[in-house]
Swiss-Prot record:
This is Electromotor neuron-associated protein 2. It is found in: Endomembrane system. It comes from Tetronarce californica (Pacific electric ray). Pfam families: MBL_MAP1B. Residues 305-350 are annotated as: Disordered. To T.californica electromotor neuron-associated protein 1. One of its GO terms (biological process) is regulation of microtubule depolymerization. It is a peripheral membrane protein.
Length: 350
């Protein structure tokens, strides 16, 4: 009875009411590198875009996608990066996917909805590649997984992607001395966009535990030793969260190289381990790098050179300059015995 009462009294908004279509026509074109940070609620959400390509990182914790007011003006979302399995980043993405499914099922209504309103509902960006590390148990939907909000959201994400015909791509880095970039976009005369994966590591203990043994609980003993020597009891989705460094290389050598780090929910030690593998990259050795600066020789700062020159000059001047001679004593002259003429005049007047 309580369920029937709720179904009669509570109205669930449709995907088109939750994510309204744009009010104006045309698409938004982002020509310069930019990064939009959205109010993700308890989670995060950001969009990084360059001229010709964009990447959406996570979607926030609300079903009403916090990024929708901007994204609905784009003709395409080229890539979506889901850093981890969680209720703080998947609901916003699921809201977008649910709307895309509703667009496929939408038919011209014979009721009050006019043809123009029906066509407006179909205006939304196309979806490109989706990066998402998913355990094998979630794909098979085994009943052994514990019921949890994050697991439910991940299952919904997989169901929606399957209906849309999108296969999520895994993302990790191979154990090597250095990290090779993943080319996301390259256009002659415009630039190149690369992505370096810092975490997780392929075939590591964390990834094997996530893919094979993780039962959906928030914290579990992974058998992995932390830097303090104790066995790690940490959230497995956080331990295997994707951390990516996105780098934009413009074609113009005088333009700035843009570097954006998306840490996800990875622990700090995992992020630092990945950054150690990137120490050989020249564009990380400058605070504001350009390809013109990297091509030139490395020169120390001017301030340090002037200080060194001043010290060497002072030492050489001390060696070359003669020692100052002692001042000669000055003889004191005796006062003269003559009377000043003024005294005589003063006496005569008296």
């Amino acid at each position: 009875e309580f369920t029937e009462y709720l179904t009669e009294s509570v109205e669930v908004p449709s995907p088109f009411d939750l994510l309204e279509p744009p009010t104006s026509g045309g698409f938004l074109k982002l020509s310069k590198p930019c990064c939009y940070i959205f109010p993700g609620g308890r989670g995060d959400s950001a969009l990084f875009a360059v001229n010709g390509f964009n990447i959406l990182v996570d979607g926030g914790s609300e079903r009403k996608s916090c990024f929708w007011k901007l994204v609905r003006h784009l003709d395409r979302i080229d890539s979506i990066l889901l850093t981890h399995i969680g209720a703080d980043n998947l609901p916003g993405i699921n809201g977008l996917l649910q709307r895309k499914i509703a667009e496929q099922d939408e038919e011209q209504s014979q009721g009050s909805t006019t043809y123009s309103d029906w066509m407006k509902n179909l205006i939304s960006p196309e979806l490109g590649v989706v990066f998402f590390n998913v355990p094998d148990k979630l794909k098979t939907q085994e009943s052994s997984m514990r019921v949890k909000r994050s697991i439910e959201e991940a299952c919904l994400t997989l169901q929606y992607l399957t209906k849309l015909g999108v296969n999520p791509e895994p993302l990790n880095r191979v154990v090597t001395a250095t990290i090779d970039p993943i080319p996301l976009f390259h256009k002659m005369g415009v630039g190149r966009l690369d992505m370096y994966i810092l975490n997780p590591v392929k075939d590591s203990k964390e990834m094997q535990f996530l893919m094979q043994k993780w039962a959906g609980n928030s914290k579990a003993k992974t058998g992995i030793k932390l830097p303090n020597g104790k066995e790690g009891e940490i959230s497995v989705p956080y331990l295997t969260s994707i951390t990516a460094l996105v780098v934009w290389h413009p074609a113009n050598p005088s333009e700035k190289i843009v570097r954006v780090l998306f840490p996800g929910n990875a622990p700090q030690n995992k992020i630092l381990e990945g950054l150690e593998k990137l120490k050989h990259l020249d564009f990380l050795k400058y605070p504001v790098p350009t390809h013109k600066d990297i091509a030139g020789p490395l020169t120390p700062p001017v301030v340090k050179q002037t200080k060194i020159r001043q010290r060497t000059d002072s030492r050489e001047s001390l060696k070359s300059s003669p020692k100052p001679s002692a001042p000669k004593p000055v003889k004191k002259e005796e006062p003269s015995k003559r009377r000043p003429p003024n005294t005589q005049r003063s006496r005569r007047r008296l």
